[in-house]
A protein has these predicted regions:
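Short, charged beta-turn/beta-strand-edge "cap" motif at the junction between a beta-strand
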Residues: 1-5, 46-50, 137-142, 236
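DUTPase catalytic domain/fold
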Residues: 2-7, 36-37, 50-53, 79
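Short acidic, glycine/serine/threonine-rich loops at helix termini
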Residues: 8-9, 52-57, 144-148
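Short peripheral tails and domain-boundary helices/loops at the edges of structured domains
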Residues: 15-36, 59-87, 152-173
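Alpha/propeptide regions of enzymes that mature by internal proteolysis
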Residues: 16-17, 24-43, 52, 127, ...
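Conserved mixed alpha/beta catalytic, RNA-binding, or beta-rich assembly cores of soluble enzyme
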Residues: 93-120, 124-201, 212
């Protein structure tokens, strides 16, 4: 999980964990045929979890961190259908992978930071059945993933979801001819461009322009017509 499995009992404190172990990812995996300038296709086939999730919030963390002066931790039992919250609520399981991607171009990027390589995107659409495409910056792609959640809301408001160790089964396919600038996701209902930036406004601009480039280049549609269609059926999240 994102804490490196360091929170296992109610006595474990986030004040005492090794923060260098935060957001670990399994990898890197060298993918034969993946070349710099191409893309890597990643299909999420299955996600399985351990039997316990750790949740947390604290001072200066997340949206409400100004209200707290210490860390708070909750441990939640997990089964194949629900996450049990505080022995009061059964939350339906919503498996997703928080950290997923390939090696970035240039200097290393820690697993807590998102970018064009993927990384800590914390996107709830990254779940079983989804297919992602990443721009490859170095030969072999060097794929990795981790930071899984058994349930998490969009925005991860308190700084952590239901952080849960487990196993992801994925299928990796090299696409050396595909050119993309940022991660792309598709599932049974949606086609999604994903962008990361210093501000939400900047990220939204990049994602929309990426979508316009992809759709127009593949369909031959006029940019003004497609932009109007975006206003009718497109969503920015």
């Amino acid at each position: 999980d994102c804490f490196g499995n360091q929170i296992q009992t109610k006595e474990d404190s986030l004040d005492c964990i090794d923060w260098d172990m935060i957001n670990p990812a399994t990898g890197p995996v060298y993918v034969e045929g993946a070349v710099a300038g191409g893309a890597l296709k990643v299909t999420i086939d299955n996600i399985e979890f351990d039997a316990q999730a750790a949740c947390a919030t604290g001072q200066d963390e997340g949206v409400c961190g100004d209200r707290f002066d210490k860390w708070s931790v909750a441990l939640c039992p997990v089964d194949d259908k629900t996450v049990r919250w505080m022995d009061k609520l059964d939350l339906p399981l919503r498996p997703m992978i928080g950290v997923i991607g390939v090696a970035p171009a240039g200097e290393p990027v820690n697993c807590g930071t998102p970018g064009s390589h993927g990384g800590n995107m914390d996107n709830t659409a990254i779940t079983t059945g989804a297919t992602l495409y990443f721009p490859v910056a170095c030969d072999g792609a060097l794929f990795g993933c981790g930071d899984m959640h058994s349930v998490m809301g969009d925005g991860e408001i308190g700084v952590a979801g239901a952080e849960t160790a487990g196993y992801a089964t994925v299928t990796l396919t090299a696409l050396p001819e595909l050119k993309i600038a940022n991660p792309v996701l598709e599932n049974e209902t949606h086609f999604v461009t994903i962008a990361s930036a210093d501000t939400l406004d900047q990220a939204a601009d990049i994602a929309v322009h990426n979508m316009l480039d992809i759709i127009c280049s593949r369909t031959g549609a006029a940019e003004d017509e497609m932009t109007m269609l975006f206003s009718l059926i497109g969503d920015v999240k």
